[in-house]
């Protein structure tokens, strides 16, 4: 394979047949990629295109995530091109030392699917080291008696390179007395020896300087030098001689320090001091020590086979005359099973998807034992019962894969322990543990803690208050288990849902957006959803039923008698001869609440004459408790309170004005001075009534003038007979007999009352009529009628107000019993406001009914004009027919024509009230 991008550099090309057979017997080796590169390549240099050599396209690189798994980061893979690049310094001598072959082996890891490939990069040596001597100069003593041909061992140079780039030869500077001889050891290394060419004469030259040069075989060759200083000494004829040139011994690596390795021995044939031999290492050793007298070599430190398998030392023997002899000591270290196997994980997936299929690759396992032979052969096993297994991939390489289904909710993590045991005696083992976390997938939907929820909320709750909280749990983790809440549906209007309730998406709290009213909304149901944040998201629904509880938030409302603008009711008449237990009237009230909050009770708060009347606690009936006494006032006042049964109770009050009288005329003088409250909102109505009254007066004056002129032209005395006493022709209601009758011309005074309360005014006759015979002004109250304001009546003597039908009870203004009808059918009674558009029609209807006696005021005998549906459930037999006291000037035909002319409508008949009632029912 080539080293350039796109092809494998200098890889061994095996025959096709051999590759086929090799793939059958050893599939793991088929995935091994080989490269050959020189050492000391610059960082970023391209070794080869690993992606192309593995069969990956450029488009696959982002998903396959090709990378290098190695203990030391010598190489890296380009994410864009898939090229294998140099990432750190490649020093062959540092990586492999003196080994003849140097290769770096590592794994290339690819994902999706996860797999790994063996890569072998052979490092070639370059001539980057020069030969070096340990000393820049050294001294050598040679006796002048030394014979020509005597050899002296010189210092050896070192070259870290191997092969041709290593040390190849030595050279010596020219000197006629010396020559250089190069010898080779058994391991192929060369060392120099200095040979004496002729006898030295100390007296002529006692000191010689030579230069020794060491050269390697590179191109160009590199060299190193040292200075050789030779001192000529006096004669010492015999040098020491070792009994062996090379000493060899084997030593176990576990021997303790101080163990004797061997003993070297040398002899010298001289005598005296020249025969005394001193032993020393040619180079200072740190592992072994040498006894200078005995030549015994002992261990100084603990030996380690894995660090150095053999030692080679040079021992010198020097006699007293300075002659030196050398021998070589070679110590071979024998391996012991003293290293446990080492287990390391590569490309470990710490997070495993819980839906991973069996056989998914989890990690690569590397086993390394520094021992050799059987001591370095390792067996790997997986401890415990876990859903994983290990598969042997190649020598000392294994795969950790899944061997079953995973469920994070049951077991979120696994503690995987792998034990490696060698085959030594005794065997050594080591274990490594790793925690594998299971990554969650969204396989669990949220689950509510209850199948359904039911809450009760009292009405009038503050807006924004929490009314309920639902909770759902999800067994998943992270976003898969993060639950958010929402309102999916309800039985409320979709557009109005947001104005009623809202829900916190995080806490599941349901908030009320408004104050609930029990009288409007008593219950509603929501469909809530809990949804996780997984992809795809899972959800669950639950129903929440909200019951709105009633509170006593509605005070009783008095329907009958209705309250006036001043908060009091108009008066009722009681016969003077009423016996105890006589039903005077009935207070009718309703309460919009329910239950005890709507259970009404009636109480007398204040009475002008205590003990004269009694009030039914539950019925509200006002009855006479005793007969009217002489000292009792004719006018009585009762302040009635209506309370409900709530806690605390709410109440409403009504004031009853009761008048003891047998006829209406008896109480007229008392009520004439009754002040009429003003209503600022009726100013516009007042002006309309005044304008209408002026038009009516002008019309009536024209009619009267026409009648007077006609009578004056007539010669018949009978035409003036109506002005005689006791003879008066009347049209419409009958005037009471105590009215003055005569043939005098009529005189009219206009009673103008405030339009807000007295829209219907009656005319008052001339001064011949007594004060007790004053005509009443109409009131819309439906009970008795207050008199007109005297100041107003005198200020407009020329005006006459038209008749009004508002003094009659309408269908919606008649009171009913408590609880007899709903709130929609019970309007305020009486209604003091009138519709200006129907004013003329009401006047005509009133005039017609007054003329023919069909007014609803007398619709039933003794019922005060109340219908059977809405009237109080009692009769007032004692109340006189006060319609005979109401006098409306003008004939029915005249009023009808006038009304029709004004309105452009047909004349109104006596059934005008029925039409009005029918119109309301149609609404």
Swiss-Prot record:
Molecular function per GO: calcium ion binding
Compartments in which it is found: Cell membrane
Which PROSITE patterns would you find in this protein's record?
CADHERIN_1, CADHERIN_2
Entry membrane topology = Single-pass type I membrane protein
| Region of interest called Disordered, as start-end residue ranges on this chain | 794-832, 893-923
Biological processes per GO annotation: cell adhesion; homophilic cell adhesion via plasma membrane adhesion molecules; nervous system development
Gene name, please?
PCDHGB5
Q: What is this protein called?
A: Protocadherin gamma-B5
Extracellular topological domain ranges are 31-687
